[in-house]
Structures are given as C-alpha cells and as structure tokens.
C-alpha cells in the first residue's frame, strides 16, 4: 500500500515538473529558431552566445567587472533598500492597523504618495542624495515600502475579532494583545508584503542602475552592453535578474508554507 502511494506521488511530482519546464523549454526553442531566421546578433543573439556569457561568470566583461561582481553589487543595493523599507513600513503598518488615530493621521498622506511610481522619484532622489549609492537605495526603498506597509496594515486589521476577545477574556491588556496576538496573527500577511516588496525592490534596482549615478550593477551592465550592441550580455543579465527574482519569491513562499500552514487551515 505504501509503495503504491509512493508511486502515485512520484508520478504527480514528475508530471508537475514536466509542466513547469515545458513552457520555458518551448520559449528557448522559439528563441533559437527566431535567432537563426533573423541571423543578426545585434537584434537577437543565438542561445549558445548567451549561454557562453552565463557559463563564465567570473570573467571580466566589457571592462566593467565580471557578472558575479555586478550581481553582488545589485544584491547589496537591494538588501540595503529592502531592509530599510521593512524597518520603517512594518512598525508603521502595525501602528496604523491597530490604532485608529495613527491611521487617520497617516492614511491621507500614504494614499497620496502610494500611486506615484518609484522612478518618478528619480529627479528628487538625485537632487537630495546626488550621484551616489544613496540615490539608488532611496528608489529601492520607495519601491519596497508601500507593498510592505499596505499588507502589514491589512494583516493587522484582518486579525479575527474572536481572537482578540478571547485574549481579553483571559486578562490580556492592550500592549499584550498587540505583541502576543495581533502581530503573530498578522505575520502571514506581513510576509506576503515582504515577498511583493522584494520583487519590486529587485525591479527597481535594475532601473535605478540605468541612471547616470551608477557605474556598476546589472542595470548598468545592461545599458552599457546595449550601447556596444552586445545583446548576448543584455539577455544574460536579464536571465540572471529573472533567476534571482524567482529564488527570492520561492524562498519567501517556502517560509510561508512551512511556518504559516495554519493560515490555510483557517480559510
């Protein structure tokens, strides 16, 4: 009986794996066929040319350092902006979600600033911080801040009332309810905000690195390679960006599935 169940599980996993890789594989085949048909690497390079860039990550490329060097620089910028956004957005979101007065005070300003795209802040960022790291980190901060904040507020406001009433019945007071009931119960929503914020932060760093203030990073390398008509390098950088974004998302989803399984059971 156990062997039969294992066999079914292996079949399901194999089918799921095939489904997951079939579309990317088809995209690669179409890409290669189009590249052969166009026969112009400036418009669309062959798959082999891009792979050749990817399999030499430690080699210097176009005089801008290696792929690894530029990737690490971009990751450091994302971490800085993302951690700063989390450090501000999570406490503020908890306060706005739990205290009506704080929400009334901050809500109008937040809703006014939230629709503004991160790249619209670029002129102000350059004016405030100059041509340096802080201008790029600020753009990343703006991109990650609002998804984390909104999900935190939503999570705190969405804590079931019976849960709070039960804590009150057991003698818990305002601060204890916030720390021991509200924050743990809203953690899944906060994590969702972190997942969305991380994705946007990663997109923002690439855009920020295309600005005049940058001389390294994947975004800078994309623009520099484009100026030299090296589309193989451009696509290689795009693939790295996509892979890192995928790893970030899957990592946070794994944490959500592993430690917040009770949330799915409640639904």
UniProtKB/Swiss-Prot annotation:
It comes from the Archaea. The keyword Transmembrane helix applies. It is found in: Cell membrane. The chain crosses the membrane at residues 18-38, 48-68, 78-98, 115-135, 136-156, 188-208, 228-248. One of its GO terms (cellular component) is plasma membrane. One of its GO terms (biological process) is transmembrane transport. It is a multi-pass membrane protein. Disulfide bonds: none annotated. PROSITE patterns: ABC_TM1. Gene3D superfamilies: MetI-like. The keyword Cytoplasm does not apply. InterPro entries: MetI-like, MetI-like_sf. It holds the Pfam family BPD_transp_1. Residues 71-252 form the ABC transmembrane type-1 domain. Keywords: Cell membrane, Membrane, Transmembrane, Transmembrane helix, Transport. Probably part of a binding-protein-dependent transport system. Probably responsible for the translocation of the substrate across the membrane. Belongs to the binding-protein-dependent transport system permease family. CysTW subfamily. PANTHER family: ABC TRANSPORTER PERMEASE PROTEIN MJ0413-RELATED (PTHR30151:SF0), ALKANE SULFONATE ABC TRANSPORTER-RELATED, MEMBRANE SUBUNIT (PTHR30151). This is Putative ABC transporter permease protein MJ0413. The lineage of its organism: Archaea, Methanobacteriati, Methanobacteriota, Methanomada group, Methanococci.
């Amino acid at each position: 009986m156990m062997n039969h169940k294992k066999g079914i599980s292996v079949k399901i996993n194999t089918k799921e794996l095939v489904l997951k890789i079939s579309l990317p594989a088809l995209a690669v085949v179409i890409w290669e066929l189009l590249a052969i048909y166009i026969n112009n690497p400036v418009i669309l390079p062959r798959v082999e040319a891009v792979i050749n860039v990817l399999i030499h990550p430690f080699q210097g490329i176009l005089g801008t350092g290696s792929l690894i060097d530029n990737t690490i620089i971009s990751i450091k910028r994302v971490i800085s902006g993302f951690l700063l956004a989390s450090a501000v957005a999570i406490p503020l979101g908890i306060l706005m979600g739990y205290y009506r007065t704080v929400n009334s005070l901050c809500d109008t300003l937040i809703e006014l600033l939230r629709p503004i795209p991160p790249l619209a802040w670029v002129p102000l960022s350059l004016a405030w911080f100059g041509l340096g790291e802080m201008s790029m980190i600020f753009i990343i901060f703006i991109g990650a801040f609002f998804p984390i904040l909104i999900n935190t507020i939503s999570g705190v406001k969405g804590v079931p009332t019976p849960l709070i009433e039960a804590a009150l019945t057991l003698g818990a007071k305002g601060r204890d309810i916030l720390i021991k009931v509200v924050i743990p119960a809203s953690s899944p929503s906060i994590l969702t905000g972190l997942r969305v914020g991380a994705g946007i932060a990663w997109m923002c760093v690439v855009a920020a690195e295309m600005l005049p203030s940058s001389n390294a990073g994947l975004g800078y390398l994309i623009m520099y390679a484009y100026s030299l008509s090296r589309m193989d390098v451009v696509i290689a950088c795009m693939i790295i960006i996509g892979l890192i974004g995928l790893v970030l998302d899957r990592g946070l989803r794994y944490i959500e599935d592993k430690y917040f399984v009770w949330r799915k059971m409640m639904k």
